[in-house]
Amino acid sequence: MIELGVSLCPFFLAALFEIRGGYLICLWLRNNMRAVFGPLGRLMLAVCGIIPTFQPSHFGRVYAAHGGIFIVFSLIWDLFVDKKIPDRYDHRGNNNVCGCFHYVLRLSLIGRYSVISFCNFQTPRQRISDFFLSRSIKHNFYLFFCNQTLGNYFV
């Protein structure tokens, strides 16, 4: 479980820097705050682009994972910093993203696209049968999240 936290830490940092940097630029341009907010926001956005390079996976996979974490962090930011409760459009957008993520998971189980590996099965048929015939799907998700590092989530 500690490995999972260590693997997710750069993603959380990148999301925090991206949201904070964009927020500072927004304050600077929209609310006419001090001029120091603009360069500071740009610096934070630049750091946000550098942080994901510490992940071992390739660029596309890292940014796909970063995108999911960014969505969650932006809603948390909206709730606690801007004091805005997410409305129905926010929830619809989140549901669309979760639906797309669910679709990608299904494709990886079928074996059409090997995006996410739940277990280290060799063939798509083994992946499907062993996933559904084991103790439970919940058990497999537990094994997936607790026993692999983030770099091994992506095949």
Swiss-Prot record:
Cellular component terms per the entry's GO annotation: plasma membrane
Primary subcellular site in the record, as a coarse category: membrane
UniProt-annotated location(s): Cell membrane
Entry keyword set: Cell membrane, Membrane, Transmembrane, Transmembrane helix
Pfam families: UPF0060
Phosphoprotein recorded as keyword: no
Superkingdom classification of source: Archaea
Residue intervals passing through the bilayer: 8-28, 35-55, 62-82
InterPro entries, per database record: UPF0060
Membrane topology field: Multi-pass membrane protein
Keyword Transmembrane: yes
PANTHER family recorded: UPF0060 MEMBRANE PROTEIN YNFA
Family the UniProt entry places it in: Belongs to the UPF0060 family.
UniProt protein name: UPF0060 membrane protein MA_3936
Native species: Methanosarcina acetivorans (strain ATCC 35395 / DSM 2834 / JCM 12185 / C2A)
